[in-house]
Amino acid sequence: MTAPAELSPTLQLACDLIRRPSVTPVDADCQAQMMNRLGAVGFELEPMRIEDVDNFWATHGSQDGPVLCFAGHTDVVPTGPVQQWQHEPFEALIDADGMLCGRGAADMKGSLASMVIASERFVQDYPNHRGKVAFLITSDEEGPAHHGTKAVVERLKARNERLDWCIVGEPSSTTLLGDVVKNGRRGSLGAKLTVRGKQGHVAYPHLARNPIHLAAPALAELAAEHWDEGNAFFPPTSFQISNLNSGTGATNVVPGELTALFNFRFSTESTVEGLQARVSAILDKHELDWSIDWALSGLPFLTEPGELLDAVASSIKGVTGRDTQPSTSGGTSDGRFIATMGTQVVELGPVNATIHQVDERILASDLDLLTEIYYQTLVRLLA
């Protein structure tokens, strides 16, 4: 284990944050540590406690000029069985292989530390930089995400705040730091479908209407449907049934109702309204007695090549020597809320191989490189 005195400022802060057990939506004073450091170099701080969620908004610089925002979350997922970890989940140690171990090392306290240290250095080196450096941090990303970034964005919109560019510190890298940046995400549209039949005895099927039998052809058609072709940035829209429930538990009873949960991960080639209309048409075609509850988790967003993506890619190349690959794969992130402000959004963070797993870990030296990438991006855009 590396002694604390030997650690860089980024690693010292990362370890301090990891040692705080901030299981969602608890912040465990992680944001206080970040705000203390940012405030010390002249950031204006605005804590935003919304329901049971801690958030903060911080800015440095002038209203005139572009705004570059760092976004992220201090909350982490539960550890799972602690006895399965090689080290205590919140111990934050660097092992003999140079790996920083602990819950949140990759997702995403390492990124938070890199953002803070890079921004400290930037505003000290360029005190009269153009535009603004901003932070939007929440403790509600791994949970319901109702009172975190989404709610803060609504407040920022209400007072006409502008965000030109945003770097979300999600662990985007796959094998090597910076090999992948996320320049967009698919939308997520979920639904609970209820199909009604008529309960009865299995020996008298003519007196019952089995909703499983009735719904099966419609569900099969939905699963086989080709929703769109995708495009240069997104794969085709996908449809997946995640849960099917029906029956009383008895083998001699025809159930009276079936429920199905399904989800679309959809590209910019499809719309919410279009997907809903096509689902309705298929269900009606099969003459079902049905109802549906829709839940939109987020719309798709895309940052095409331009100032932000170019600056990030150039910084990665300059620091690591490697070319990055923009990607829109994976699940949703808080970037979907920030993109509604008309903001160019990219996600850049550590290697994601162990996120949410037992023994979450990243190469400790990657965090100093990530700090330099963030710093160089700031210089390219705001110096």
Curated annotation (Swiss-Prot):
Keyword Metal-binding: yes
Protein family membership: Belongs to the peptidase M20A family. DapE subfamily.
Sites where the protein binds Zn(2+) 1: 73, 107, 170
Organism superkingdom: Bacteria
Positions contributing to Zn(2+) 2 binding: 107, 142, 356
Cofactor(s) in the UniProt record: Zn(2+); Co(2+)
PANTHER family for this protein: ACETYLORNITHINE DEACETYLASE, N-ACETYL-L-CITRULLINE DEACETYLASE
Identification of the protein by name: Succinyl-diaminopimelate desuccinylase
Cofactor descriptive note: Binds 2 Zn(2+) or Co(2+) ions per subunit.
Organism classification: Bacteria, Pseudomonadati, Pseudomonadota, Gammaproteobacteria, Pseudomonadales
